[in-house]
Amino acid sequence: MATAVSAAVSLPSSKSTSFSSRTSIISTDKINFNKVPLYYRNVSGGSRLVSIRAQVTTEAPAKVEKISKKQDEGVIVNKFRPKEPYVGRCLLNTKITGDDAPGETWHMVFSTEGEVPYREGQSIGVIADGVDANGKPHKLRLYSTASSALGDFGDSKTVSLCVKRLVYTNDKGEEVKGVCSNFLCDLKPGAEVKITGPVGKEMLMPKDPNATVIMLATGTGIAPFRSFLWKMFFEKHEDYKFNGTAWLFLGVPTSSSLLYKEEFEKMKEKAPENFRLDFAVSREQTNEKGEKMYIQTRMAQYAEELWTLLQKDNTFIYMCGLKGMEQGIDEIMSALAERDGIVWADYKKQLKKAEQWNVEVY
């Protein structure tokens, strides 16, 4: 807590007149104020003692309200909670990966009648039907919204998700199915779904319509960026028109796993000066060294340009997807920063504080 010190100093002259001075000091450290005799020399006579009267208060200075660089005005969180979820209905559920893709991913649209006021970059929770092994309701699972606030139908009455069906073999050789992902991927139109939220402010879009927005996604981590890009390039808003640069890097294992490819290519055709698109298909592509093309491998091909952009105060990085992607991206940035005598870990902290480095991995 800051401490305010107010000191009154009286300097009596040989003619019995007095001079009074008052000052205030704000210090962020604790102040130990000791009474110390202070002398001054009066040119008309000898030295005289100055008396000091101190008043110490512990009133904190008024906090300066931080102004966010993101579109956070009026953002609502946790309108619906697990005990009282919103009950929506499935309107559409379709598989968006090829039959030969390693795993299924589904795009689904739920009716909300405008009751779940999410924003681009937020998430919603879903509670699967049924109970767990202990007879209790299943815990909610969070999913990034894959639609803009207007929804896929443009009427602000729906929300869309992008969900991969989780199926794996455990240590005992048994097939295990993720409860919520399989519940969602199996939903039929008309079925009810319990929704909580919306939640999250980390991944909200930047306010600046002239910003450079670099999006790094693996797999279903594409969801929030689809919502960004729909708002940027497929919609018209009275209070928002994107004039900056949106650059999407999407990493997947096979071409049949590329999500929303046709949509993104249409956006590129519509706004070639504002939208850049780079895919990294690890099982099918390699770089000039013959290395598999992961998302960080693709980024390395643009390392100099990315580093230059990252040093501008209107460049925003968003990362969403598998947790493993973060290390590879950090390694690229660390090498570039070191070349300029910068410690990447410290620089990244500054970017996070400035809301320019935003991560949501799982």
UniProtKB/Swiss-Prot annotation:
Q: What class of enzyme is it?
A: oxidoreductase
Here the transit peptide covers 1-62
Any one GO molecular-function label of the UniProt entry:
electron transfer activity
Membrane topology field: Peripheral membrane protein
Instruction: Name the cofactor(s) required for activity, per the record.
Output: FAD
Cross-referenced InterPro entries:
FAD-bd_FR_type (IPR017927), Flavoprot_Pyr_Nucl_cyt_Rdtase (IPR001709), FNR (IPR015701), FNR_nucleotide-bd (IPR039261), FNR_plant_Cyanobacteria (IPR035442), OxRdtase_FAD/NAD-bd (IPR001433), Riboflavin_synthase-like_b-brl (IPR017938)
Q: Which residues cross the membrane?
A: none
Please provide the record's keywords in A-Z order. Answer: Chloroplast, Electron transport, FAD, Flavoprotein, Membrane, NADP, Oxidoreductase, Photosynthesis, Plastid, Thylakoid, Transit peptide, Transport
Which Enzyme Commission number(s) are on file for it?
Answer: 1.18.1.2
Q: Where in the cell is it found?
A: Plastid, Chloroplast stroma; Plastid, Chloroplast thylakoid membrane
Task: Write down the Gene3D superfamilies for this protein, in alphabetical order.
Answer: Nucleotide-binding domain of ferredoxin-NADP reductase (FNR) module, Translation factors
Pfam families per the UniProt record, alphabetical:
NAD_binding_1 (PF00175)
Which GO CC terms are listed, alphabetically?
A: chloroplast stroma; chloroplast thylakoid membrane protein complex
GO BP of this protein: electron transport chain; photosynthesis
Q: Which family does it belong to?
A: Belongs to the ferredoxin--NADP reductase type 1 family.
PANTHER family hit by this protein:
PTHR43314
What name does the UniProt record give this protein? Ferredoxin--NADP reductase, leaf-type isozyme, chloroplastic
* Record organism: Nicotiana tabacum (Common tobacco)
Per UniProt, what is the name of the gene that codes for the protein in this document? PETH
